[in-house]
Every structure is written in structure tokens, then in C-alpha cells.
Amino acid sequence: MARFIFVTGGVVSSLGKGITAASLAMLLQAKGFRVSVRKLDPYLNVDPGTMNPHEHGEVYVTDDGAETDLDLGHYERFTGVTACKFDNITTGAIYSKLLKDERLGNYTGITVQVIPHVTNIIKDFIMSNTNGFDFIICEIGGTVGDIEGLPFFEAIRQIGNKLKSANCLFIHLTLLPYVKTVRELKTKPTQHSVKELRAIGISPNILVCRAERNISKSAIDKIALFCNIKPEYVIPAIDQKNIYLVPIAYHNSGLENKVLNFFNINLVPSKLDKWYDIIGKIKDSNSKVKIAIIIKYHKSHDAYKSVIEALNHAGIYYKYKIDLLWINAENLTEENINKKLLNINGILVPGGFGVRATKGKMIAIKYARTNNIPFFGICFGMQLATIEIAQNLIGIKDAVTEEFKIKGTKIIEKINKNSEDVTITIKNTHISKCTYSEEFECDTSTVYSNIHEDSNKESTHRLPIETNFGNISDIKKTMRLGAYPCNLVANTIAATAYQSLEINERHRHRYKFNNEFQNIFEQHGVVFSGFSKNKQIVEIIELPELRWFIGVQFHPEFKSKPFEAHPLFIQFIKAAIEYNKCN
């Protein structure tokens, strides 16, 4: 039977519960255990797919097409285990299922309540799909005391009572703030956080204390005394310069051994060679390469979390520090671009939606193309690159994307159901219309995803929930989600990078390149080096006459890992390093 580990947080949010859960999973893996990591989010959205990136951060897409929390990216990057739709759940998804079942009469007329009905669905999610794993680590989003999180805490309390300590462990992450006037780390917020957790009925077995400096033995003893925890089970979590130093820091504190001791499991040696290799490369990274990221969502860099990490992975590969220059595309003009992109070694335009900030992005793309600066366009960045090429290189001055709903020559068009030759199925029907406060208006329409090899296997899991909040009359409104195969053209930059002619990458887009313009683009030097299996969707474009200019329709950042950097990011950083040396 799998053992369950619940990671909760207190005092403040964004303490690093996801990194802690991912680090522990990796450390247990290093001892030979099989681990699954899951995220339970208390918000009422069905999934993050329609949430403002400024507010939520990036939407992390799994192979099977689930739009999930960015913490699943940490889980994948640290453990190397591919996440799936069964690894993330929200309050919105839970209530969607609950209300649907109630309307269908599945509750046989009884009064439907938070306890036991909501908590039962949460428990079903946690306890399902556990075969083949030694440990299930569940991160509870938010902080203890949040109203929206109470059903989740109640559910894991019930699981703890049922499984007892032999099979269930609670880890609580708190903050020890440093007060400069007294030059002391304060333990009182941690004491109150544990008090709040115990009032719910959960007594933490391990306390992980986040601090900006070393924690004294007297502070640890004080925390242990007032929180009723043995001092050896109070684990310091000192701020690190790089998140990939965190797992080894936890290892040096004995976190995974404390977990195994709690479960009375014999200790075995850890195999951490690849992580020590990463740490060595990070510490040996003395040179820098400067990359400009041309962004729309400038209030939170978490909107581009996987892109940041993928760049860092390539930097680790070459023992280079990645110096990121964040450029708000709305403030970029023809007049100031030379000043803003001074001494840049590479330009990256990541994915996004909507018309806002596109002018600045296209100015940056033109600047990269005309100055022969290494360029990498991802998803929407690739689409804008084709529009820029059409307008300024080919001469199609009115080139536009259908997404903007303005008159012009549609270089980018909406995907239709026949654009993909693999079998597709409706994943979700959570159709809603939402307007971001400072964003674009978006239609969240019928979502399609390809059926993967294991999609036909019977699952006892009740989630993800199929909901219906609208009329799915317009079947052409599609979102191409998840991993799809892509065929590469031999002797191209892409084929050289991948060292293969068949790849599989994750997607999240509604629009694609209009194939009617392929010939005229090729006449002007554009190489189409990647296609979907039936060649209906262009996946990769290149300008081989330039130093390094590539746009991809997919999201390669989702598959990059610190010990296995993505080949396209490796080649992009290589080109940037060479450009830096030449200039």
C-alpha cells in the first residue's frame, strides 16, 4: 500500500511548498522509491486554463492535455516523472462534479453537504490511482486558515485518522521572519500557524521552517517545544540562490531520512550523482549570456516559469549563467529598441494570447531578424514571426492573424477539426466566457486532445470532471492541447538539434499557420522544418541564412529538465554564446 505525505503551508503563501514537495519526491526517488506528486488547489476555477497569468502564473500543460498548476512543472522537472490529469484538482472541478451528480439524482434525494460529500470527492481523488507507487505526496494549495481550503484540510484529516501514522505523514511549511531591529528570527508566526492547523485536527509530524539565514539551535528547540514536535523533526529551509540547490540542502538536513524513520522504513543509500553534477555546473558557471524575453504579462514572471527554467537548464548544460532582461512589449518602440536591447545575445518571444503588446513583440522580432541576433519564438511567438516576415520580408503588408478579428490577409488561421490526422476527443466542455480585468476577452471553447496510448485504459478515478456551462454549437472553436507527434525535415536546424526526425511535443493553441502561403514563404528563404503527422499544421519555421532563427508552434519548455535540457534551448543558448563571443 502506498504511504501518503501531505504538504501544507502557513504564515504566508508562496513559501515554496511545491519546491519542497518536488524535492522530497526526488530524494525518495534517489533511494529507489516510486513517488507520485499531486496538487490540490482550493480556488473555484475548474482549471487554470482561463485564469489571468498575472494572477495565477503559467498554465502548465501535461502530455494528456490537462491545463494545470505551475507546480506540476516543478514536480516533473525534479523527478523526471511525467504528470497527468490525475495529478491536479481544484475546488471548481470538485463542485462541478458534485452539482452534476446532484442534478442526475445520484445522491438519491439526501441533503448534499460539504461534509461528507465534498470531502469524499477530495478523498477519492487522493486515494485513487495509487497502484505502483510507494509514496503519494499531496501539496495543499494556499495557507492554513484560508476559508476556501477548509474542505481539503478536513479531507486529509479524515485520511490521517483512517490510515494512522503507519501510512500517513503531515509536513507543514512555515516562515521564520527576520526582524532587523532585534537581529532575530521570530518563531511566533510558526507557533500560531501550527496552532491553527491543530485546531483543524491535524498535528504536523515534520516542520519545515523557511528562513533567509541559518536557524539557531535555540530557535529550533523553542519551535519544537511550543509546537509539540521533536527537535530533529524541525527542518531548516534556508534561502538558496538557485532552486536546484534546494533538494541537496534538504538532503543535508536529513529530510528524506526523517520521513523514512517516521514510517519505520530501513534507510538505504541515496543515488544523487546527477544532482551533484548539476550543482557543480551551477557553481562553475562564471560566464554570462544575456537573453531578452519580450513579454506581455509583466506583473509576474511566474507567467513564464517553464521558459525561465528551460533557459536555466541550457545554461547549466554550458556552465553559463543566464542573465534575463525582461522587456515589456507594450513599451517597446522602433525608437527605443536599440537602447533597450543593447548588448543582448539572444531574443525570445514566448507564448501568449490576444492583441495587446503584439506590436512591440513584432518590433523585437524584426530587430532580431534584421540584426542577425539569435531568435526563438514559441507558440504565439512563432505565429507573430510569420506575420513579421510576411509584412516586412515578403511584402504582404496587411498580414494578420485570424485571432485579432481584423481585416487583412490571414497568415494565421483558426484550427479546424480536420487539421489533425490523429483521433481526437472532447476532453472537457467547460465553456465559459470570461473577461480579464486588463486582458483580452477569451472564449474558452470545446477543448480537444489527441487520444494517447493509454487513454482507452479503464480508470477508477472519478476525475477530471466533465462539466458543461455553455452551448457547444460551434465545434470549430478548438484548443489543441497536450502532446502531439511532429515529423521533422532532414538537414534542418531542428533535425540537427533533436538528432531525430520524429518528436513529440506539448501544445496549447487555437490557431495555426495558413498553409496556402507556404510556397511564397519558401521563395523568400523560410524553411518549414516540422509538421504534424498529416502535414496540416506547421510546427516549426526556420530562417537558415541567419545565425539562429526558429519559431515553434509547440511549448518545448514543458519538457525541459535540469539534468536533460531541451535540445532547442540548448541550441538557442549555444547560438547566443557564439554571438556574444563574436560581438
From Swiss-Prot:
The active site is at C379 (nucleophile), H555, E557. One of its GO terms (molecular function) is ATP binding. GO terms for cellular component: cytoophidium; cytoplasm. ATP binds at S14, L15, G16, K17, G18, I19, D71. It catalyses: UTP + L-glutamine + ATP + H2O = CTP + L-glutamate + ADP + phosphate + 2 H(+); L-glutamine + H2O = L-glutamate + NH4(+); UTP + NH4(+) + ATP = CTP + ADP + phosphate + 2 H(+). Residues 291-582 form the Glutamine amidotransferase type-1 domain. Its EC number is 6.3.4.2. Residues 1-265 are annotated as: Amidoligase domain. Mg(2+) binds at D71, E139. Pathway: Pyrimidine metabolism; CTP biosynthesis via de novo pathway; CTP from UDP: step 2/2. Keywords: ATP-binding, Glutamine amidotransferase, Ligase, Magnesium, Metal-binding, Nucleotide-binding, Pyrimidine biosynthesis. Belongs to the CTP synthase family. Homotetramer. CTPSs have evolved a hybrid strategy for distinguishing between UTP and CTP. The overlapping regions of the product feedback inhibitory and substrate sites recognize a common feature in both compounds, the triphosphate moiety. To differentiate isosteric substrate and product pyrimidine rings, an additional pocket far from the expected kinase/ligase catalytic site, specifically recognizes the cytosine and ribose portions of the product inhibitor. This is CTP synthase. It comes from Rickettsia typhi (strain ATCC VR-144 / Wilmington). The gene is pyrG.
